[in-house]
Amino acid sequence: YPVMHSEAITHRKDAVVPMTIVGVPPMEDGYLGEAIGDAFLPVLQFQHRDVLGLFLPLETGFHNLAIVSSKKRYPRQGRKTALGLLGAGQMMFLKTIVAVDPNHDVKDLESLLDALDSKVDISEDLIVLPGMVADSLAHASPWDNIHDKLLIDATTPLDSDPRGRREPLKGCPESLEVSASGIDGVIQARFLRSSMLVVTTKIEGGPSPEENVEENDEEG
């Protein structure tokens, strides 16, 4: 991949290097990405007839997360739909895909949190696919072009699905938020839902969001 050091950026109709401005979301590529996703959804549905809706959130940089609503004529159909998408062209670079109910608005991230909180059993509904294809630019991959993928089944089980006969899911005690805040290195802890605790940490020697790590990378 070429490396360019720019001193000034201008624009014209016949650009020397046509490109979008990327960086910490939201940026120009974010809105273009959502528009492209909406435009190509009918094409995807022609090849994958179970797909009802698909959304790659800007907040996760597109290739890190996909939310797919699937038809549900038989048990675990959402999982089958999600697995099919993981082999569909550039979607093979996805890291995480979440299957949701047919009536779920895939662009409503609050509804996604509700589904993850109320319908996902960690022991049964998280499927890890080890050693799958990764993007060459994926910074978190342990090896070049290889990483694990995660499929989350956040659909409501059908009556014929053994998942539908399990006990109702339980949340975490509110005291856990206070306990987590007291852990060394934890700056902030907050419940997003009754079973979802998010913590902000500070790693000693780690870069701040305002710091440029380019020189450190070159030295390494």
Regions found by a protein language model. Name each.
Residues 1-220:
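Charged, compositionally biased interaction regions
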